[in-house]
């Protein structure tokens, strides 16, 4: 087990030998030569958000709320493409926006979660896709409600440091308070919801804060056992964002954080988004990643629209060059496909 002090020394070191030693340890501990991915459809239910993050282009004051028939059409088409994950995403607390609320009311819904529940249920009844929801902070009761129609759910921790709430990254984003995010991730554990979380590298955090964030995820998982994967995501500059002059993390920074994440989190899958790391993603296989995350043959990444998904054939070539077999997975990892972790309806659908 690596300590926080050892982790910090590693991040500060410029020694190639220290990297090679840890890579040797990871290789010795890793028996599988598979790297997984989920073939998905990205459904941006609504692109308004109460948070105004310094690195985000998803939020739009002139929001679009997808209509039910629009989502039905995307899901039906995704089914023909062989997609098995429906990624439902919208901004946090969109009900705070009176215009969004009014649109939902006109369609006969009391709020966005009722709307989401209905489209998720439709997805389960009419396609072979399984819903995965990522929509910001949710309460215990809201998580419990959505558990009935989700195979898994997600929320990026991003960073466990409250200091970042006073920086350009999160000063206008009340939902990025790490206490709120940790509480939700823990509530998901209490409810036995298979969960995806992660850290965001390069938004002004210190090396110590990166390490603390990974150890916080480890602490939560040790208590509840529900974190199926952790995303190590790199900040990318986008034109027009408040942080457009910030420096992106270097490949070495990412390489080291992936190594540490693998060693600290042990049995949790480590994911790096391939569309944000086209030039370096292949190298990160050597650092310990074992999942490429969601990749869509149909829809773009609406959070990072400037970064197209690689073709699945391209991912296969990337993986095989380092001896890895590309393996498709569901949005819920295999070890969580039990009655303990899934609603009866979801479990029956998977087993069928």
From Swiss-Prot:
CC cofactor: [4Fe-4S] cluster
Free-text remark on how the cofactor is bound: Binds 1 [4Fe-4S] cluster. The cluster is coordinated with 3 cysteines and an exchangeable S-adenosyl-L-methionine.
Pfam families: Radical_SAM
Entry-linked PROSITE patterns: RADICAL_SAM
Disulfide cysteine pairs (residue numbers): none
Residues covered by the Radical SAM core domain: 35-275
Enzyme Commission numbers on file: 4.3.1.32
Pathway: Cofactor biosynthesis; coenzyme F0 biosynthesis
Catalytic reaction annotation: 5-amino-5-(4-hydroxybenzyl)-6-(D-ribitylimino)-5,6-dihydrouracil + S-adenosyl-L-methionine = 7,8-didemethyl-8-hydroxy-5-deazariboflavin + 5'-deoxyadenosine + L-methionine + NH4(+) + H(+)
Top class in the EC scheme: lyase
SMART domains named in the record: Elp3
Top-level taxon in the UniProt lineage: Archaea
Sites where the protein binds [4Fe-4S] cluster: 49, 53, 56
A GO molecular function held by the record: transferase activity, transferring alkyl or aryl (other than methyl) groups
Keywords: 4Fe-4S, Iron, Iron-sulfur, Lyase, Metal-binding, S-adenosyl-L-methionine
Stored InterPro entries: Aldolase_TIM, CofG_family, Elp3/MiaA/NifB-like_rSAM, F420, rSAM
CDD domains the UniProt entry points to: Radical_SAM
The protein's assembly and partners: Consists of two subunits, CofG and CofH.
Function: Catalyzes the radical-mediated synthesis of 7,8-didemethyl-8-hydroxy-5-deazariboflavin from 5-amino-5-(4-hydroxybenzyl)-6-(D-ribitylimino)-5,6-dihydrouracil.
Similarity comment: Belongs to the radical SAM superfamily. CofG family.
HAMAP family: FO_synth_sub1
Name by which UniProt lists this protein: 7,8-didemethyl-8-hydroxy-5-deazariboflavin synthase
Lineage: Archaea, Methanobacteriati, Methanobacteriota, Methanomada group, Methanococci
Record gene name: cofG
């Amino acid at each position: 087990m690596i300590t926080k002090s050892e982790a910090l020394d590693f991040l500060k070191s410029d020694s190639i030998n220290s990297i090679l030693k840890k890579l040797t340890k990871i290789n010795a501990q890793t028996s599988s030569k598979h790297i997984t991915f989920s073939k998905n459809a990205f459904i941006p239910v609504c692109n308004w958000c109460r948070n105004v993050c310094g690195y985000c282009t998803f939020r739009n004051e002139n929001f679009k709320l997808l209509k039910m028939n629009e989502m039905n059409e995307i899901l039906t088409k995704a089914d023909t493409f062989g997609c098995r994950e429906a990624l439902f995403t919208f901004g946090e607390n969109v009900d705070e926006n009176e215009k969004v609320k009014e649109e939902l009311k006109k369609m006969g819904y009391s709020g966005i979660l009722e709307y989401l529940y209905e489209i998720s249920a439709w997805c389960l009844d009419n396609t072979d896709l399984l819903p995965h929801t990522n929509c910001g902070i949710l309460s215990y009761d809201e998580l419990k409600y959505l558990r009935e129609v989700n195979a898994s759910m997600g929320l990026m921790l991003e960073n466990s440091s409250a200091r970042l709430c006073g920086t350009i990254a999160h000063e206008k984003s009340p939902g990025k308070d790490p206490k709120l995010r940790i509480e939700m991730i823990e509530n998901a554990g209490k409810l036995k919801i298979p969960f995806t979380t992660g850290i965001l590298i390069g938004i002004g955090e210190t090396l110590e804060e990166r390490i603390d964030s990974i150890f916080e995820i480890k602490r939560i998982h040790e208590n509840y056992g529900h974190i199926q994967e952790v995303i190590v995501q790199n900040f990318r500059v986008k034109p027009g964002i408040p942080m457009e002059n910030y420096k992106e993390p270097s490949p070495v920074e990412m390489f080291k954080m992936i190594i540490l994440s693998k060693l600290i989190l042990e049995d949790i899958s480590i994911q790096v988004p391939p569309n944000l790391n086209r030039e370096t993603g292949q190298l990160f296989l050597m650092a310990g990643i074992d999942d490429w995350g969601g990749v869509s043959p149909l829809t773009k990444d609406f959070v990072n629209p400037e970064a197209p998904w690689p073709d699945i054939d391209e991912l296969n070539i990337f993986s095989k060059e380092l001896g890895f077999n590309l393996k498709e997975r569901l949005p819920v990892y295999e070890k969580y496909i039990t009655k303990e972790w899934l609603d009866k309806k979801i479990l029956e659908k998977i087993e069928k």
